[in-house]
Amino acid sequence: MQAYCKICDQSLRSHLADLQRHARSKKHRENSAVLNRTKYKSLMSHGYQATITAEKKIVDIKLALYITMHSSIRSVDHLGELLSTLGKGSNLENLRLHRTKCSNVIKHVIAPVLFKDLVKAIGKKGYSIIIDESTDVSVTKYLCMCIKYFDTTENRMLTDFLGILEVERATAIDLHKSIVEYLQRIGIPLKNMVAIGTDGASNLCGRNHSVYTLLKCDVPNLQLMRCTCHSLHLCSSKASEELPGSLDFLVREVFNWFSISPLRKINYKKTFDLINSGNDAQKFRQMIQLSRTRWLAFYNVVKRLLEQWVELKTHFRIACDAEKCYTARTIRDMLENDCNRLYLISLVFLSFAGQILKPTFLRAAHNKSLVQQVIDAVGNDLAFLPVAEVDFGQEFRKEFQGSQISAERKSQIQQRCFNFLKRFLTEMAQRLPTNFEIFKKIELLSPSRCTLQVRIKFEELPLQDFFDSDCDVSLYKSQWEKLSFVDWNAHYKGDVPTNILVFWPDVYKYTDACGRFIFRELAEVVLKMLTIPTSNAVVERAFSALTLIKTRIRNKLSTSMLQSLLTIRMHFQAHEKCCKMFQPSTEMIDRFKSSFMYESKTGTSGPSCANSDSEENENESLHEMIDIISDML
């Protein structure tokens, strides 16, 4: 298929590079210069107005949202034409939605309204930010920001996507400057920041010079919370040094053995089906890859390996003779070693977070705080049970007693598993947050404690760091004293909820017989404290969404488009909604016009949209020109 230039009377390949090259040629410029470029009046100047009904706008907005959530923008070219063909006699018959229009609907209609609603919902209330930095497939470094706040509309705590900023360097000064300027541009007061959540990187939360220390100069009562998931990962990684290093080799190489060869997987499946023939036979399932960055995620990997232990042992016995491979012999020898099986069984038991953190191996203590009990005990060897009395789980005990391993080797296995637990607790105690006292006292605000007639004094509550500088503390104290006078069982018409994140939002909305919010100020302070994040998993999800959106093929997405796509996707994820339930708001329908969609050079879905990439718009126009020329041939 060829394109044709009417000015030069010349046929061209309908490729973007050829059209651009011809447009820059001397011949085309000279022929274009002699043309009569008289501009004709537009239909608009004669009073003609193109009207699009609200129903058609809703169709375009919903379809653009579907594309944002589930597909690439380029696919709307074919999807729009297909729906127009199949929708004869309906609103879809006159559907005219292609990638240029769809992109502008996303950037200038949907995303700006959702972002505006987010900023409005945050308002002047306290909030916490969760930050992390990463590099995408195009080697562009981004700073991602999420925000945790109490949404009065939905009456619950939400963690939503706030923005993604392109940064040149990830130093503490540069990141701090980007965060402060961003919050100022979008209208969120910096002084209302309660806490900052990070993954533990030194440039983000270092003790001497970091983003946290710089922000603390602006907000003196700022709290720091390192991600518990990352901290547990580091604790587990350090503790795993007490176990044989061959376990990691075994788990990884078993997966690698089948991942590079379909023939090996087919042969193993035949062996598996032969061993598991019968009505009660287990179903064949593939091996799972062990993550290099999430040590705590080894549970499913080890469990799958133990489930197929006999089948794997049989397969590698055959593979040793068939392939004469050193790796196969090594894996076979490790599978035939019962010590390795015992270690893996103990790992399955220890991998449950509750079992890891629960000190069942400690002697009884009178300390009511479980975590404090662990902290006090890790430095005292007398606090631990003898190794022989430590419980590593029923399956481990059964396998341990039936094993033919020598008594010396059994004692060695028990000791190393015990050392794993002890090392884990030691590492965990070292990584506890500096503001640990606040988390210890959160229990005092639980529904079961604060609704009792005999309660702790107001001065002992962990709220002092969250009061405003000009607040009336006596007002909070009086509301705290009145809290136990309410019959909460009658209010809930049953049992009082035990979840603190359910109870205090209801306290925030509680009114007396006159309709007055009698606990509003106290509830605001408590909810402000509860915005402190416990992990930065939401930022990791945002980066995962970025990886799915910006791939090797779609590696030229501008930051403004990326911001809009992530704003929409993460909004629906945070609010637990789907595109099927979406109804465009009145403001979205009002913004669906050319003055917002095409003439705006600065984006409105967040400050990052001001970095709109003009090259992307030029490329889209050129693609549209190619499509028009191709349709004319």
Could you tell me what each predicted segment is?
Residues 1-633:
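Alpha-helical structural modules in large enzymes and assemblies
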